[in-house]
């Protein structure tokens, strides 16, 4: 107010305000300032009584309070272009999909399967079932080998017995052959027991 006192028209305004106090109060202004005194309804109704363009600024601030992120209308065209460019870049990123089938490289380490590794794994996988089957075959094969060995030992003993010059040697071999023949029936007996064990029990056949 001190600055207004230096003006020449201040005294006239003061007299007009004193002469017509009712007009000043109905307008809600005193000396160019808005008096609210807790009366918010004047702002809500959109009273245009404010001066110096403060009403427009208030409306903009109220509108901006809802969306403070919105750019100014002049900048919308400029802002839309970078957004459009950003949307063009995002489909490029979406085209790259994560897949376990693709090879990965971490600082020079390649996790891609090579043909050699795949072949080794296939051979190992093929060897595993073969080794599982071999124990069954091995059991039968060992029995067959024992029988063949026993027969092979018996057959050479027979030709040795035929020459008459080697009768003393043949007599020494005969007890050995007799022992082998005795061992052969024992092998056959064990074979029969194993065969009976290898045949499934009736309860196992039902399953």
From Swiss-Prot:
Q: What happens when the gene is disrupted?
A: Morpholino knockdown of the protein results in reduced head and eye size, a ventrally curved body, and enlarged brain vesicles. In the craniofacial cartilage, the ceratobranchial arches are reduced. Formation of ceratohyal cartilage is disrupted with an abnormal angle relative to wild-type. Morphogenesis of the developing neural tube is abnormal, with a smaller angle between the walls of the hindbrain neuroepithelium at 24 hours post-fertilization (hpf) and in some cases a partial opening in the dorsal region. Some deformation of the midbrain walls is also found.
Membrane topology designation: Lipid-anchor
| Organism of this sequence | Danio rerio
| Molecular function, one GO term | actin filament binding
Q: In which tissues is it expressed?
A: Strongly expressed in brain and eye. Also detected at lower levels in muscle.
Protein name, UniProt field: MARCKS-related protein 1-B
Source superkingdom: Eukaryota
Keyword set for this entry?
Cell membrane, Cytoplasm, Cytoskeleton, Lipoprotein, Membrane, Myristate
Annotated region (Effector domain involved in lipid-binding), positions in chain: 93-116
GO CC annotation terms, alphabetical:
cytoplasm; cytoskeleton; plasma membrane
Residues lipid-modified (N-myristoyl glycine): 2
Task: Give the family per the record.
Answer: Belongs to the MARCKS family.
Q: Where is the composition biased (Basic and acidic residues)?
A: 78-90, 131-154, 163-182
